[in-house]
């Protein structure tokens, strides 16, 4: 079967690839909007708001309920925005505030897909995005060890 991403599969900026649920290939073919077949960001929109991770597109999967995908507007031949940059941006204080300013506090926090679409993200030139991602990936593991 085709694995189904649930909110618990997106934790602390990483994907947990142990799946509890799968759907048959025939059902998958009937649900193209929830298919994930290329690199994108995944985020729960109920419960753990702001918990985002990059899906590398290395296998076919599906979105479970309460998990959304963020596909960036890159062309097939040219990259303008790095998924890893958007991940780090949305995990930053400013990016998290931008993402969560639309959340609804009920029994479980939630954010609508339309609200996610309206999040403003500062996008520097591609080379600057690469430098930012590389520096964060170099420094943050050291910071984690110091905790």
Question: Where on the chain are the PLM-derived regions?
Answer:
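Short, conserved charged micro-motifs
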Residues: 77-84
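Sequence-specific dsDNA recognition surfaces
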Residues: 8-38, 58
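Extended boundary segments
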Residues: 1-6
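Short, Lys/Arg- and Gly-enriched loop/turn segments at beta-strand edges
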Residues: 49-56
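Amphipathic alpha-helical coiled-coil/heptad-repeat segments
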Residues: 96-98, 102, 114-147
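Generic structural signal for buried aliphatic residues
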Residues: 41-43
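A short glycine-rich beta-alpha junction/loop motif
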Residues: 45-48, 60-69, 84, 104-123
